[in-house]
Amino acid sequence: MPSALAAAMADGLRDNPVINYAIAVFIVVALIYLAVLQFWVLLRTRKHLSEMKSAYSEIEIQRSELQLRNKDLTDSLNYARRIQAALLPSEHHIRRIFPDYFIYYRPKHIVSGDFYWFSERDDKYFIAAADCTGHGVPGALMSMIGLELIHKIINDMKVDDSDQVLLTMNRELESAFYKEESGKPIIKDGIEMSICIIDKKTRLMEFSGAFLPVYIVRDDKLIEIKGDKKNVVQSFAMVSFNRSTFTLQDGDLLYLFSDGYADQFGGPDNKKFMYRRLRHILLTISKYPLPDQQRILDETIDSWMEGHDQIDDMMILGVKPF
């Protein structure tokens, strides 16, 4: 009975034109709504795509501008590197003084805050290694000032004592950086530096250091002469530096360096290389020809870094004076 009733009601609905019309209107309205909704979604999608395309174009423009600026900056740094290289002693000049030497010189960026100096005057050899505060452009500018000053102090002012070289450089930098108008130094950066002055006749070496030491390898032993724990132009107060002496023999090796090699992070635990490892490797490789020593130092630090970024400029000088 209920099934027969339901069938009768269904037949009645199909035969009712009002209901059929209402259903048709509902279906048409639903289709129109869906069409409008789809059209609206399409417009929003097109607008979004247009905005994305505009943003992408803007990003491409900015990327092109950044690439151009980076190229300009890199070109400027490369040119600055050539200027810096022109100020550093040439290979021909150094080899004329010390036929047996190497220079491991590895800037963090294109230009370096480390610099070295070799000179010969009045039967004396002059060797210096310096590490200016910072690296990159600021360090390079400071190093260029330091190169000009050491040339002036040793060759023009003819300062012969190692401690006086550091003291004179301190005074020259003080004069350059101190401004009476404000009563304060405009630059507080300093220079870590080591300098050896060797008398060719007596073979007596004078050494003074501002933080940096000198290593001497003789008969499979490493001798360290430490520098003072103060920078050149660390402060503008009255300063002084100690002077040590050491008589060199045939076959002695001198190593001067900045702190970049020892401070480089790496290894299995991402720790600093440290000076004890540097002393060990220098003593180990001291029996090899100096060009081979330079290669081994480069390979060693590359292996130690294991993909880590270089954190500072690196410089190691190896010299056999006699």
For the regions a protein language model found, what residue spans apply to each?
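Exposed alpha-helical structural elements
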Residues: 8, 72, 82-83, 168, ...
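Non-catalytic regulatory/interaction regions at protein termini and inter-domain linkers
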Residues: 1-14, 290-304, 317
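Active-site-proximal, acidic helix/loop segment immediately C-terminal to a metal-coordinating Asp/Glu
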Residues: 137-160, 248, 252-308
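Generic recognition of well-structured, leucine-rich alpha-helical segments
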Residues: 39-41, 176, 285
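Residue-level detector of alpha-helix boundaries and kinks
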Residues: 30, 37, 68-69, 154, ...
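… and, occasionally, acidic/histidine-rich disordered N-termini of signaling adaptors
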Residues: 57-254, 308-322
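N-terminal membrane insertion elements
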Residues: 1-53, 268
